[in-house]
Curated annotation (Swiss-Prot):
This is ATP-dependent DNA helicase Q-like SIM. Pfam families: DEAD, Helicase_C, RecQ_Zn_bind. Coiled coil: none annotated. Belongs to the helicase family. RecQ subfamily. Transmembrane segments: none annotated. Residues 437-448 have a biased composition (Polar residues). It catalyses: Couples ATP hydrolysis with the unwinding of duplex DNA by translocating in the 3'-5' direction; ATP + H2O = ADP + phosphate + H(+). The gene is RECQSIM. Its cofactor is Mg(2+); Mn(2+). One of its GO terms (biological process) is DNA recombination. CDD domains: DEXHc_RecQ (cd17920). A motif (DEAH box) lies at residues 288-291.
Length: 858
């Protein structure tokens, strides 16, 4: 049928060819027929000689792809009744070549006429639409399954070289792919930045089937799709941030090699995915960030828990056209032994599931812990001085520009109203309280529960940060020529190489620290879920373009980031879990060079659990993880890398890493605490003896505990009670800080001498103490055998603090001394109390105005 030139070009483009190729072909054949134009392109007479199938291009309609994978389900061959084996695809090209029959009609669109049969050359091009052509050179096609099984790795290496510029597979990647080739499920645990993504990207290129990847974040899926397009792999993502409904329709027609989808969406798409598996084939279901499956993990997501529907709905016993179950590959960088077991059970993976483990040890990461009162802005100057000095060395060429940028940024009125040259500090000069109230009002309208300091929690992250309004969710496979056009970094970008990410617990801190860093001349940006999406996208882009030096962020930032030149990760405040810490710290040093991972924490205070929506069971687990973080920070004698690696169940091969602060500075001197431990244990034992016997069996009065009011309060005295009684009985330890005794109690608990009295409620550190049988045997009152221990961080901190008095009693006695009284009064006069006006935006402020109307008039 003859068509006009424009219609003919449109029809050829919808088949999947480039528009320029179509124009040239139509012009060459005189616009006579579609068949002639297609044949002209396929014979290599056109401009580039390249055939681009629809699966590798972003077409505008909901059309179906060309070739074997687009054949209607009614195709007469018996092979179409079932999804073939993975290895069948290794020889499919050879089989198609031998067949004498022609292909059936190729459906392009319901309104288009069928394309007639083409020559043998056309059939060769159409059959392996998704196949990696470089893996199947002429004359080297496989003839049998055994040959396919023995040579698949060679083909993978060819794909790696041609598509990704990688010479060969790593050992864990080879093991994971071997498991997939054997049609078995797999759980891959590999360190961040080790190349887990290749484990599920290769199957799509190797077989020509579709790979479905479940991923938790839209931003993560967006980045992955963009990277794949640069490697000539077509991909799309489906989820709440996907605004184009046509993309889902095209994805379910098999038009993309890899489909990224969020867990909430994949449950809805079970039926369309089953149809996709029947018509085109699904090579693999990959569950990225699989730790989100486990309720014991640090990043549990309820919708991940529902992914067991994949095993239930894509097994050979339920679908007749499947010869084997569609393999499931779960991947994560952080999972303890308990989390691993929970993942396998929750996903209903088979008993033959292979667990692929790599070492969690990253030798180029230097871990350290430093004391800081992170809640106070007065600590910023001391804590970030090294950071300022680091970037000041590179400031000579850009110093003047930074000053201008800082002034310009103060004039901005919106977090997103800046160009690529502006610093990401916006209207920080506004009243901080008004800014917080406006953010709270904005978020409360969405029905979100936020704490006073706008704490980041799981729900908030995935609902706010990840709901980006992405303009395009499908990504074309870019031609090779585009891959070579890698932009050369400018001198300015080179000066900014070596980025820093500062993780903070609250949104307020992210803004305050970013403001401070901008004030001292650094190029910094705040990133948290309450900021406008435009600002977040700009920060994300500038971070990747090396236009920033520091990003100050909550946990909303960083998942899936593959930035090679991050030189320092700072956690400013206590951690919530070691899993999250190791994952976030692993974003540094991905180029293999040395990188620092520093934890700043107030070692004088135990961490508190950030508020979030948790069940009672999850709360107990959260406290356990918080306690592990606390002990990690207090450690002064054991290699930090060893602690982290063994936390994930891996046996650390060497005694130390020789790079963390403990290994480089060495542990503190051993201290004999036999006397202190015995004394504390005696006080504890005496109390419990009287409580248990409720008689005169124990000389309770001898320890000053006889008529204590605390004894009547549920018989549950806390550690501070015992410390106060110990001080009363022993003048020698009257000046010893409570912080030191807390550290000693923690050591005694670790040794098994004492334990928590109440096991119902989880706590970060021991509070209600009772002695153990081991303690009664080991801590013999008459035994003078020394008990040497390494003082922990809080114990060392207490020894450094200058104390002029011991406790509140000593402080109160100081008022009786005329000189001390005079000094204290002078300090008050020098720093008069600031009169605070009532804040009418708060209930307390409005009430104060009504009760004290004269204050508001002043």
């Amino acid at each position: 049928m003859d068509l006009s030139s424009d219609q003919l070009v449109m029809k050829i483009v919808e088949m999947g060819f480039e528009k320029l190729d179509a124009l040239e072909a139509v012009k060459a054949v005189g616009g006579k027929s579609c068949d002639d134009a297609v044949e002209y392109i396929l014979k290599g007479n056109h401009r580039t000689g390249g055939f681009k199938p629809a699966s590798l291009l972003c077409s505008s309609g909901s059309n179906k792809i060309l070739g074997k994978r687009a054949m209607p389900s009614s195709f007469s061959s018996s092979e179409s009744k079932r999804q073939s084996s993975l290895l069948d695809h290794f020889r499919s090209v050879n089989q198609n070549k031998k067949k004498g029959d022609t292909f059936g009609t190729v459906e392009v669109d319901s309104q288009l006429e069928t394309v007639s049969e083409h020559s043998e050359e056309v059939r060769k091009s159409l059959a392996p639409v998704f196949m990696e052509s470089s893996c199947f050179p002429e004359g080297q096609l496989l003839n049998g399954c055994s040959e396919a099984s023995s040579s698949w790795e060679k083909r993978v290496n060819s794909i790696l070289r041609n598509r990704f510029g990688i010479s060969s597979l790593r050992s864990f990647q080879r093991e994971a792919l071997s498991t997939w080739v054997a049609h078995k499920d797999c759980l891959v645990l590999a360190a961040t930045g080790s190349g887990k993504s290749l484990c599920f990207q290769i199957p799509a290129l190797l077989t020509g089937k579709v790979v479905v990847v479940i991923s938790p974040l839209i931003s993560l899926m967006h980045d992955q799709c963009l990277k794949l397009s640069r490697h000539k792999v077509s991909a799309c993502f489906l989820g709440s941030g996907q605004l184009d409904n046509c993309i889902e329709e095209k994805a379910m027609q098999g038009m993309y090699q890899i489909i990224y989808v969020c867990p909430e969406t994949v449950v809805r798409l079970i039926k369309p995915l089953q149809k996709l598996a029947k018509t085109h084939g699904i090579a693999l279901f990959a569950i990225d960030e699989a730790h989100c499956v486990s309720k014991w993990g640090h990043d549990f997501r309820p919708h991940y828990r529902k992914l067991s529907v994949l095993r239930e709905n894509f097994c050979a016993s339920n679908l007749e056209f499947l010869e084997y179950d569609v393999p499931i590959m779960a991947l994560t960088a952080t999972a303890t032994v308990n989390v691993q077991e929970d993942i396998l059970e929750s996903l209903h993976l088979s008993k033959e599931t292979k667990i692929v483990l790599t070492s969690f040890f990253r030798p180029n990461l230097q871990f350290s812990v430093k004391h800081s009162r992170t809640k106070f802005a007065s600590s910023y100057a001391k804590d970030f001085q090294n950071l300022v000095d680091l970037y000041s060395e590179k400031k000579n060429s850009t110093g003047k520009k930074l000053a201008v940028i800082s002034r310009e940024s103060e004039e901005q009125t919106d977090f997103g109203s800046h160009d690529s040259e502006n610093i990401h500090e916006t209207d920080y000069d506004e009243d901080e309280e008004d800014q917080e109230n406006s953010l709270a009002k904005k978020n409360s309208s969405n029905g979100k529960e936020l704490s006073e300091a706008y704490l980041e929690d799981e729900t908030d992250i995935f609902q706010s940060v990840d709901d980006w309004d992405v303009a395009c969710g499908e990504f074309c496979a870019m031609p090779s020529c585009e891959l070579l056009e890698i932009p050369v970094p400018s001198e300015k970008q080179k000066d900014l190489e070596g980025l820093t990410i500062i993780y903070v617990p609250t949104r307020k801190e992210s803004v305050n620290i970013a403001k401070y860093l901008c004030g001292v001349g650094l190029k910094a940006a705040a990133y948290n879920a309450s900021l406008p999406k435009k600002h977040l996208r700009q920060v994300h882009q500038d971070f990747h373009d090396n236009k920033l030096q520091v990003v100050v962020a909550t946990i909303a930032f960083g998942m899936g980031i593959d930035k090679k030149n991050v030189r320092k990760i700072i956690h400013y405040g206590w951690l919530q879990s070691l899993e999250a810490y190791y994952q976030e710290a692993g974003r540094a040093g991905r180029d293999g060079e040395l990188a620092e991972c520093v934890l700043y924490a107030d070692l004088s205070r135990a961490p508190t659990l950030l508020p979030s929506r948790r069940s009672k069971e999850q709360t107990e687990q959260a406290y356990k993880m918080l306690s592990d973080c606390f002990r990690y920070g207090m450690n002064t004698s054991q290699c930090r890398a060893k602690i982290l690696v063994e936390y994930f169940g891996e046996e650390f091969s060497s005694k130390k890493c020789n790079s963390c602060d403990v290994c480089t500075e060495g542990p503190p001197e051993l201290v004999d605490v036999r006397e202190e431990a015995n004394l504390l244990f005696q006080v504890i034992t005496a109390f419990h003896l009287q409580v248990d016997n409720d008689s005169e069996h124990a000389p309770y009065e001898d320890y000053g505990l006889g008529n204590s009011k605390q004894n009547k309060l549920s018989h549950k005295p806390n550690l501070l009670f015992f410390i106060s009684k110990l001080r009363e009985q022993c003048e020698k330890f009257k000046e010893t800080d409570c912080l030191w005794w807390k550290g000693l109690a923690r050591i005694m608990e670790a040794e098994g001498y004492i334990k928590e009295m109440d096991n119902k409620d989880r706590r970060v550190e021991i509070k209600f103490i009772q002695p153990t049988e081991k303690g009664k045997k080991q801590l013999d009152f008459q035994d003078d055998k020394p008990l040497y221990v390494y003082p922990e961080a809080d114990m060392l901190l207490s020894l450094k603090q200058d104390r002029t008095y011991s406790g509140f009693s000593e402080w109160g006695k100081g008022w009786a001394d005329p000189e001390i009284r005079r000094q204290r009064l002078e300090r008050r006069e020098r720093k008069p109390r600031r009169e605070r006006k009532p804040r009418k935006k708060r209930t307390r402020g409005r009430s104060s105005t009504k009760l004290h109307p004269w204050r508001s008039k002043e």
